[in-house]
Design a protein with these regions (language model features):
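Conserved hydrophobic residues forming the short capping helix/wall of the S-adenosyl-L-methionine
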Residues: 16
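A short SAM/SAH-binding and catalytic strip from SAM-dependent methyltransferases
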Residues: 42-57
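Short conserved loop adjoining the S-adenosyl-L-methionine
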Residues: 34-39, 54
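Conserved SAM-binding strand-loop segment of SAM-dependent methyltransferases
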Residues: 21-32
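Conserved SAM-binding loop
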Residues: 12-13
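C-terminal substrate-binding/active-site "lid" region of AdoMet-derived donor-dependent transferases
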Residues: 57-111, 118
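Conserved SAM-binding motif I beta-strand of class I
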Residues: 1-3
Length: 120
């Protein structure tokens, strides 16, 4: 987990510890744009939907693709009337850097769709 907010980092550390996942999840407090690959290969990167509310979304995605080794990327989005509740991600921007693989739309009471992309 890469997070720049100290409060979010501390909450995340507490959650990871409570779940007993310290050996599986690493938390780094830093700004993502100054974070460079640490030689790890990641199976998946999960992009927080708040990323798409910032003005530097493209810069962040470009940095991710150029500097982090990963196979897949999961993104939460919304479609249709659900956009009244949440911001839809810019899929065209994502497709500029990543290859779309799968879209899972909600069933029953689930609000969000999940997009799966692969690293090109």
């Amino acid at each position: 987990l890469i997070e720049r907010d100290e409060v979010a980092v501390e909450l995340s550390r507490g959650l990871v510890q409570a779940l007993g996942l310290e050996d599986k999840i690493t938390i780094k407090k830093t700004d993502f744009l100054v974070y460079f690959e640490d030689a790890s290969d990641y199976d998946a990167v999960i992009l927080a939907s708040l990323l798409f509310t910032s003005g530097d979304t493209e810069e962040l995605i470009s940095h991710l693709v150029k500097n982090i080794k990963f196979k897949n990327c999961l993104v939460r989005t919304v479609r249709g009337m659900r956009q009244l509740l949440y911001k839809k991600v810019d899929e065209k921007l994502l497709e500029k850097y990543l290859k779309p693989e799968l879209l899972v739309d909600p069933q029953n009471h689930i609000l969000n769709s999940i997009l799966l992309y692969s690293h090109v």
